[in-house]
Amino acid sequence: MFWFDKQDPRALFVDIRRETWITDTRPGASPTVVNPDVLADFSNLPFPDNSFPLVIFDPPHLVRNGKQSRMSRKYGDLKGDWREMIRKGFAECFRVLKPEGTLVFKWNELDVSVAEVMALTPERPLVGNRKPATSKTHWLVYLKPNDRGERPERITPGAHEKGNCERSL
């Protein structure tokens, strides 16, 4: 749960669950609240194609936790044919992403390697953290091609200094 402000009007929070429960019984601990703006499955999003300039995809990553475990309740878990579910999730994220839009993908390797998950989409990340030093959480950033299937144009190096922003592929 990495939101700075879940009420930020620039963000649309989507989850398959709407729940509140106590996962930490220590004095002063807050309940876990999952209260999305839109209740939906990430493998079948209720939005038109090319809707968003930025999509953050943070699917469940736990396979071996019990359904009632604190981690599974808080973050969800992978069930059944989870590879197909993640494959469809990637496809849906790219479908609703605008051309030249950005997809940020978050994955923790506790149960499944990031390499195994990356193999579930034909898309390749542009940047990401290859070997997190203190955790197993990876952040990968993808850039959707434009409508012609091309990568976004780049400004020619030095063009901004000349006042001339020629573009090239």
Please tell me what each predicted stretch does.
Residues 1-169:
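Class I S-adenosyl-L-methionine-dependent methyltransferase catalytic core
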